[in-house]
Each structure stands twice: as C-alpha cells, then as structure tokens.
Amino acid sequence: MERIKYLLLFAAIALVGCQVSDEEDSLIGKRKNKVEEVAYARAFKVGVTPTMDCLPIFLLKDSNLYNPDNIDIRLKEYSSQLNCDTAMQNGRVQASVTDLIRAEYLKEEKHIVLDYMTETNATWQLLASPQSGVKKPEDLGNKIIGLTFNSIMQYLTIRVFSGHDISSRFYGSQINDIFIRLKMLNNNQIDAIWTSEPQTTQAKLLGNREIYSSVNENFIPGAIVYVNNPKIEHQRAFEAAYNKAVDILNSHSIQYFAPLIKKYMKVDDKVVAALPKITYKRVIAPRERAINKARNILP
C-alpha cells in the first residue's frame, strides 16, 4: 500500500513538472514569436519576381553579402508585378523590382512614394505559340496577347501595333501571373504573351516563337525602386550588397549560378543551360529621358 502511495505521489510530481515545462515552452515560443515579429517589422523587405533581373538580389540574400548588424534583408516573393504593386501600396516592402512605366503609373495614379534606386538589364519578349500561326508581327491581327496593363508590356504592345502593318486589331488580355501566362501559352489557351528571362528561354525550348523584343527599343525600362523613403543607411547597405552581387555575377557565366536560378525561378537545368549571356549593371540611376518617356507614355 505504501508503495502504491509513493508511486502515485511520484506520478503527480512528474505531471506537475510536465505542466510547468509545457507552460515554459509555450512562453518561450511566444517570446520568440514576438521577437521575430519586431525583427520582421524593422527588416528591409524587397519585392521580387522569379525573373533574371532579380538575380543580384537573390545572390546578395543567399550569400549574405551584407552586414546583418547594418541591415536585415528579407525577400517578398511574388509571381506577378501586380502583387509587387500591392505590396508597395500597402507598405509591405521597402524596395521592389518594377519597370519605369509601372513606377510612374503608381506614383501618378496610386500616389505611392517611390524613388529610383537603379535601372536594370531586364528585357521583354513577345512569344507566339506554334498553333497561333503567328510568325511575325504582321500576323497578329485578331490574336490575343497576354500582358499586364499599365506596364512596359502595354507600351511594347502599342509599339508593335503602331510600327507594323497589321490588317486587323489584336487584343490584350490582362494575365498578371508570370507562370499562368506561360502555362496558357503552352496549353494553346492564348496566342501570344510577353515574357522576360528565364521564362523567354523556357518558352522557346517548348517551341514558341519570338516575335518582338524590347531590345529593339531605344529605351531601358527595367528598374528597382525604394518605397516610402526607407532609412538612408539601409539604402546604402542594400546598394553596397547589390554592387557586390553584380560583380560576382559578372565574373562567372550565368550557368555557374544554376542552383540559385532553379531555386527562385522554378526552371530546370535545360533552361539554365540555354540562357543567353547576361551582363548585370552596378547601381546606376535610370536616365532622366527614360523617366520622362515613361511618364508620358500612358494616359
């Protein structure tokens, strides 16, 4: 009987000990969550898309090319520029990839406070599916093109239409998600789409044809912007890390960074192997004439 009482007492003590331990674990977990919430709120968050113009940002983040005591960089990954826009509008990011036309639209129409950090090497290509019968811009009559409105894609679409003898009008369909646009093209659900690298190479490998490219334009539209005037010390730290990443990227072939490209852009080795040579730019402000052009392009 005494032995049973002893065992029951021991079990009760053990149970109380477990309860205290669980309460401590819960309290520690809550404290950790609170610390992370505060750290996240203070972090320098960057809106990115799964495209090659974001590769310097992916590299500086994954390779820790910055002093974490000076800046805590967090990536906000989006598969559409529209989601980046929403993040900028709601103050969820301190910097974001975009294009000049989009940035000027957001400043003018949405009253978002944006400042240009740098131009980028981003280019855009118009690709048509084999089943569309489109082999050149003149064949685009009565076709449907997937794009994002109020952006470089809309500008380029207007340029294609005005610069070529197209017998009948074609139509723009707003499809914002990069992956959905590509999937629709490959499934013959749309005649043509605007893409950027690496999706351009991915689409070409699947038999789609390039009809037009932004490299034909005397205009450099790719850009990275600051949102709502982040701290100057954070801007300087981010730019220093960005320049380090650019120097590293330019010292190797693009295929050297295959793991990084596959991780963030969801492509395979075949696509990476076929990517064209890309030279990245250190931080350089967009040209004033390019900004003025973007400002006056869309109504």
Can you annotate each of these PLM segments?
Residues 15-17:
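C-terminal motif of bacterial Sec signal peptides marking the signal peptidase cleavage site
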Residues 65, 160, 202, 260, ...:
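Residues within well-ordered alpha helices
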